[in-house]
């Protein structure tokens, strides 16, 4: 895989088991409780009409808001290792825009949770608005990662 255009990751120590943290990381419908941008979302139904559950290949529609702007973003689950790794890509594997990844590492006091963001390809909006949009999205991702990690920590430790 090629190097990302830009990337960022942060970690947080959580005083909870990997299983507890995993239950939050994989509950994408709850991301709106923690994210500074995402307000929730829903699993898309497969060809049999059954909503996804977070398996590799399942698709989730995230609902996002920034100021007055609201939009939906399709993501596809690309990696899932129970209590270890959960990753998805914005735009699905076809567009391969932004990779989001959560890695869980058990330790003596609980779990280290790392969230990573990697811009792989530019969206039409990023191309249209140029570097200013790219830098804005990167700053927004950093803010969202911090908020999400802190929110998940609070939820896991409560």
Question: For each of these PLM feature ranges, what is it?
Answer:
Residues 33, 44-93, 109-112, 147-158:
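Glycine-rich portal/gate segments that line the openings of hydrophobic small-molecule binding cavities
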Residues 38, 84, 120:
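Residue-level detector of flexible, active-site-proximal loop/helix-junction positions
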Residues 19-22, 146, 150:
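Amphipathic alpha-helical segments that line or abut small-molecule/effector binding pockets
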Residues 11-15, 76, 103, 118:
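Generic structural detector for well-ordered beta-strands
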Residues 1-51:
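Hydrophobic ligand-binding cavity/cleft-lining segments
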Residues 89-147:
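Beta-strand/loop substructures that line and gate deep hydrophobic ligand-binding cavities in soluble
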Residues 2-3, 46-47, 72-74, 120-124:
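Short hydrophobic/aromatic-rich motifs at helix boundaries and adjacent loops
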Residues 7-9, 70-74, 96-100:
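Short, surface-exposed coil-to-beta transition loops
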């Amino acid at each position: 895989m090629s190097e990302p255009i830009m990337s960022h990751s942060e970690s947080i120590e959580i005083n909870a088991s990997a299983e507890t943290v995993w239950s939050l990381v994989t509950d994408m419908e709850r991301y709106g409780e923690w994210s500074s941008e995402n307000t929730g979302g829903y699993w898309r139904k497969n060809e049999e009409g059954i909503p996804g559950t977070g398996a590799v290949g399942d698709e989730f529609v995230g609902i996002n808001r920034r100021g007055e702007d609201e939009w939906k973003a399709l993501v596809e689950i690309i990696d899932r290792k129970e209590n270890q790794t959960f990753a998805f890509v914005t735009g699905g594997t076809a567009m391969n825009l932004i990779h989001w990844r959560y890695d869980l590492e058990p330790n003596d006091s609980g779990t280290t949770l790392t969230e990573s963001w990697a811009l792989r390809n530019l969206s039409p909006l990023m191309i249209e608005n140029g570097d200013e949009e790219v830098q804005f999205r990167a700053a927004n991702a950093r803010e969202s990662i911090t908020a999400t990690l802190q929110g998940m920590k609070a939820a896991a430790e409560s």
